[in-house]
């Protein structure tokens, strides 16, 4: 039962082959048995899950139907969940229980999903390895000595290990797509504004976006259907009609124009990953796609721009965690200034403190023009590069990551090396574009992903290309040994 995809579960529930409660109990037992090896969950919500599963079964018995009715999943631990700990992977929010549900959580609950728990993550979503969590590093089920990627590493590891069929993630600079690539999943970052950010604890407000993580494009389509849509509570939510993502999965790729940027194949890319990218291009050509080279001339400036903008926004967003209203509070402060200083110094981990300091520096009076304003200009140039490329092609294809998963601890003391792992993913966030990573092979037994990017609100196109690719390849069906 645990091997089933979300789509297979939907069919099984509709045909009454099993109940949601039966499935939920099987998966909760599996999590209890296997997750100690992975550390993919921060909180388990067994009682809530059984209650939701029983309610879903009752709704189905009353004649209701729906692809997500009774489907089990987990939420990344930065989505507010009413009455349940929402820690953001940080000591700062270790005891915080949200007073309300995030829009993503409430929309999926209305569709009948069953919440098994909250998944581990890099602290405040800052990281590419899921090593900065207050609750310990998450291990990659493909090799327990390796990282699963981040910051949605808990969601990625749990789905890859077949602890559950799908999970929510968030993506600020690749935090859905990069862990999806490193754990053999399909992960989608929607267009900025496609999915509500209300109740999603912010890292960088102009870059953050929630999305689905699952084993197949078909499953991502089902989950995105339940997540997407306008939300008046989110000022950045865009009132754009939500198409039927599943309906477009089987569209032929004949004549589809795929662009491969020449700048993607630079010195930092593992040549074995480059080879797998070229092989995936050949498969898509066999399906009728037309492949041509395009250029993204400002790609080289993306990482410096991103690591000014994201920390700048983080320094502002995280200023609310001061030990006064909620979250961690130091003991016996001498005065208000001491309360602020010690609560933040003790509550935040080193990577979060590093980014807050970088961001505050970039926003300071003497450096705002030189750093923050300059980074925003580069952001506009990157966006223009994509607009020019999409005038010639329908989809852009390239590697998701420059390297496969690395050993836990290997890059902990070298932040720059870790930041460079985001080279291919951050541009979609800077431009607000939708991006998808899909399984494309293995290097030394570790999964590798290929990334697809499309124009605004063309998530359906990305899912269609990935689904067609998954009809002629079997990378996405492979499971890690022992899980």
From Swiss-Prot:
What are the catalytic residues?
A: 76, 151, 175
* Alphabetic keyword roster: ATP-binding, Ligase, Nucleotide-binding, Protein biosynthesis
Q: Which residues form a coiled coil?
A: none
Q: Per the record, what are the reactions this protein catalyses?
A: L-glutamyl-tRNA(Gln) + L-glutamine + ATP + H2O = L-glutaminyl-tRNA(Gln) + L-glutamate + ADP + phosphate + H(+)
What the entry lists under Gene3D superfamilies is as follows:
Amidase signature (AS) domain
Q: Which GO terms describe its cellular component?
A: glutamyl-tRNA(Gln) amidotransferase complex
Protein name, UniProt field: Glutamyl-tRNA(Gln) amidotransferase subunit A
Q: Which organism does this record belong to?
A: Pseudomonas syringae pv. tomato (strain ATCC BAA-871 / DC3000)
